[in-house]
Amino acid sequence: MSAAGRPVVVTGASSGIGRATALAFAALGHPIVLGARRVERCEETAQEIRRAGGTASSVALDLRETDSIVAFAEAAVAALGRVDVLVSCAGDVLPETVVGTPPEDFAAQVQINLLGAQHLVSLIAPQMIERREGDLVLVTSDVVRSPRPTMASYVSSKWGLEGLARALQMELEGTGVRASIVRPGPTLTGMGMEWPAEVLGPVLDEWKRWGLVRHAGYLSAEAVAQAVVTVATQPPGTHLTLVEVEPEAPVRPPREPS
C-alpha cells in the first residue's frame, strides 16, 4: 500500500500534526483533502501544496456537528473519487478536571476527540471494506499511557479513541483495511501551548509533582507526520497496529573527568 497517488483525507489539518501530515503525504504525490473548523487555514496549506505541483482541496469540518461531518465525508469522496487513507488528527484540549467541569463542557471535548472521529470513520470505512483496501490512522496521545491531571476530558477521550481503534482492528481483520494508532508524546504545536501563563504554569507544576515531566524535549509536528506516513505506506501483509513516538531527551554535554 505504498504506491503514490492514494487519495488521503486528513482532519485537524489547519495546524500542527494534521497540517504536517497533509504536507508529508502531498510531498509523496498523494492527492489530499484537508478538513478542520478553521477552513481558511486549511486552504492556505492546500494552496501551498498546489503551488508545489500537488493536488489538494480544503473542506470545512466541525466534529461537534453531525451535519458538518456528513457533508465533509461526502465532499471528500466527491473531490477525490475515493478515500484510501483517513488520518484522524483533529483534537482539542482544555485545562479541565473531573470535579468542577460542567458536564456539557466535558462532553464537548469528548465529542471532538472521540465521537466525531467514530462518526467519520463509520462514513468512510464501508467504501474501503467494499474495495478490500484502505488505511484508518487514529492519532492519539501518550496520555493514554501516562494520564495527566488537569486534562481530564482529553485523557478520557484519547483513551476512548484507542479503545475504538482496538475494536476497529478486530472488526476489520481480514477485510484488507488496516486501523492503526499513532501515539505521540509531547509535541510542539499550538494545542495547549497557547494557554495563558497563569494557567500553564500551575499545570506544569502539577505534572512535575506526579513525575510526568522527565526532560524538556518536544517532538516536532513533522516527526509525528512521518510516523503517520510510515504506518499508512506499509506494503500489503504488514500492519503497524501501534506506533509510539517520543521526544529524545536533549543531549547533555559530556562530564568533565574528575
Label every PLM stretch briefly.
Residues 14-15:
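Conserved glycine-rich cofactor-binding loop
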Residues 39, 60-71, 103:
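The beta1-alpha1 cofactor-binding region of Rossmann-like NAD(H)/NADP(H)-dependent oxidoreductases
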Residues 121, 157:
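Active-site helix of classical SDR
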Residues 141:
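Residue(s) in the substrate-gating loop at a strand-loop-helix junction
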Residues 97-98, 102-110:
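Substrate-binding pocket helix/loop in short-chain dehydrogenase/reductase
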Residues 30-44:
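Conserved glycine-rich Rossmann-like NAD(P)H-binding loop of the short-chain dehydrogenase/reductase
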Residues 181, 201-254:
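C-terminal helical subdomain
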